[in-house]
Amino acid sequence: MSAERLLLSEKYKAFLRCDAPVEFLEGTTAAGKTTVGLFKFMLKVAESSKKLHIIAAKDTGTAEKNIINKDLGIVDDFGVLVEYNGNGTKDDKIPHILFHASGGDKVIYVMGYGDKKKWQKALGGQYGCLYIDEINTADIDFVREAAMRCDYLMATLNPDDPSLDVYKEYINCSRPLPEWEDETPQEIKEELKEEPKPGWVHWFFSFAHNLGLPKEKLDKILANTPKGTKIWKNKILGLRGK
């Protein structure tokens, strides 16, 4: 267990309390989106009536590094309640997390959306909760296939090229909650213009919402990112653009 603690700003507290079928967490780098998002995702899994769930990242190695084994990741947060089987088991060959929830064991499959043959083989049936890491980089066919099979969808992203299909088909159909609308950059609000889907929520998070980010770390991130570049616009300002 790491010495770090999950520190929650008022906006993240509101996020944890929010009950929505689909939630998109867009914003700057180091905003805490993955850290707090994963904690909520696991609570949603525990509440779900379904046994099978999915976590998707570019590949299983990325999922292990950024989601499962990171400080304040799934293993750190839930300890003995989770068992990660990175190579599957003799009964279930797909990499998965076994989550000993109060209502019974849950199986969370860990999938890489970067390998189409693999995810096509693994994806089938219906699932409770779906978490997609960096959905802006995901294969849109995976997003379409997986999203239609789940009861609850959470996805994280740093802003990217607004012409990506995932924006038009998914993210731009969500809206910020009225009480947090003013914290969403005007540029992004103007992009959220597709027909809204009932209950779909868009969350914008920035450095200011990550109470666990030390000032020295933030200063280093800012110093090491060249101004005027795409990466500065997307990851530091939290704005979309090529």
Which residue ranges define each predicted feature?
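Phosphate/NTP-binding elements of NTP-utilizing enzymes
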Residues: 1-242
